[in-house]
């Protein structure tokens, strides 16, 4: 009996321990995980870190009240240290080398980490100011260009109106010139018809004159007995009177033969009379 009782008690204790362990696991599963512990330095914004490390420099002994021993170590940058850091920053905009940081910290009586953080915050502020300055310059340029674009739009609109007016005037002028050209063409055609009739009348007059010349008897251009012939001047006058040159009759000599009296010299007229 004692053995059985001891075994039963051990079983009961084991069951109690198992339930307790199971309850602990369930309780741990239901509980949220603990929040991670974040250092107070990481919770501060980047721009406030400069002010924090300004209290870590060596200078006046202004301790923060209500912070115990931690506040006793906080000091503020002196004006001389700030001027030295400002001059070094304006001289070297780039990131300082570790050797330069250590040398500057030793000269100012600061820690290299304080100098590095001060330069980091100073560069951040300088970049933000530079961005603001660049934005202001770009904004002014944009406003100037926008006003210029608006003025150009107004000029374009005015030029478009002027172009439309000039096109209307040109179209009206072309219409007027087209009407005047038609009238001029009609007048020229009528004048051409009148001149054609006049030319026909002139041709008729010339033909009548030629017929009159043909009706006239041909003048005696040569006199054989007196050995005289018509001069070229007389021939030209007769040719001027008639537009068309007339042929001589068969009983007369040609003009070229009469115009050269030298051809008659070797022909003695006496022999002709003797023969007759």
UniProtKB/Swiss-Prot annotation:
It comes from Oryza sativa subsp. indica (Rice). Expressed in seedlings, roots, stems, leaf sheaths and blades and panicles. Residues 170-212 are annotated as: Disordered. The lineage of its organism: Eukaryota, Viridiplantae, Streptophyta, Embryophyta, Tracheophyta. Residues 129-173 are annotated as: Leucine-zipper. This is Homeobox-leucine zipper protein HOX22. Residues 70-130 bind DNA. GO terms for biological process: positive regulation of DNA-templated transcription. Keywords: DNA-binding, Homeobox, Nucleus, Transcription, Transcription regulation. One of its GO terms (molecular function) is DNA-binding transcription factor activity, RNA polymerase II-specific. The keyword Glycosyltransferase does not apply. It is found in: Nucleus. Pfam families: HALZ (PF02183), Homeodomain (PF00046). SMART domains: HOX (SM00389). Disulfide bonds: none annotated. It comes from the Eukaryota. One of its GO terms (cellular component) is nucleus. Its main location: nucleus. Probable transcription factor. InterPro entries: HD, HDZip_class_I_plant, Homeobox_CS, Homeodomain-like_sf, HTH_motif, Leu_zip_homeo. The keyword Transcription applies.
């Amino acid at each position: 009996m004692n053995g059985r009782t001891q075994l039963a008690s051990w079983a009961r204790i084991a069951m109690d321990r198992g339930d307790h362990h199971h309850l602990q696991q369930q309780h741990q599963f239901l509980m949220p995980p603990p929040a991670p512990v974040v250092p107070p330095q990481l919770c501060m914004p980047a721009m406030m870190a400069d002010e924090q490390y300004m209290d870590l420099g060596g200078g006046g002994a202004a301790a923060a009240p209500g912070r115990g021993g931690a506040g006793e170590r906080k000091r503020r940058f002196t004006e001389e240290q700030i001027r030295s850091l400002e001059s070094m920053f304006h001289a070297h905009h780039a990131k300082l080398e570790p050797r330069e940081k250590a040398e500057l910290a030793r000269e100012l009586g600061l820690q290299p980490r304080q100098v590095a953080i001060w330069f980091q915050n100073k560069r951040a502020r300088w970049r933000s100011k530079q961005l603001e300055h660049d934005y202001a310059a770009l904004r002014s340029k944009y406003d100037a260009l926008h006003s210029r674009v608006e003025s150009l739009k107004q000029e374009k609109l005015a030029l478009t109106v002027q172009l439309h007016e000039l096109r209307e005037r040109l179209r009206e002028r072309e219409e007027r010139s087209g009407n005047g050209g038609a009238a001029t063409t009609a007048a020229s055609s009528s004048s051409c018809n009148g001149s054609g009739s006049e030319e026909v009348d002139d041709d008729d007059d010339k033909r009548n004159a030629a017929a009159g010349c043909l009706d006239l008897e041909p003048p005696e251009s040569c006199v054989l007995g007196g050995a005289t012939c018509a001069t070229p001047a007389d021939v030209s006058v007769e040719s001027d009177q008639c537009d068309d040159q007339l042929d001589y009759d068969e009983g007369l000599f040609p003009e070229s033969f009469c115009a050269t009296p030298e051809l008659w010299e070797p022909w003695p007229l006496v022999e002709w009379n003797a023969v007759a």
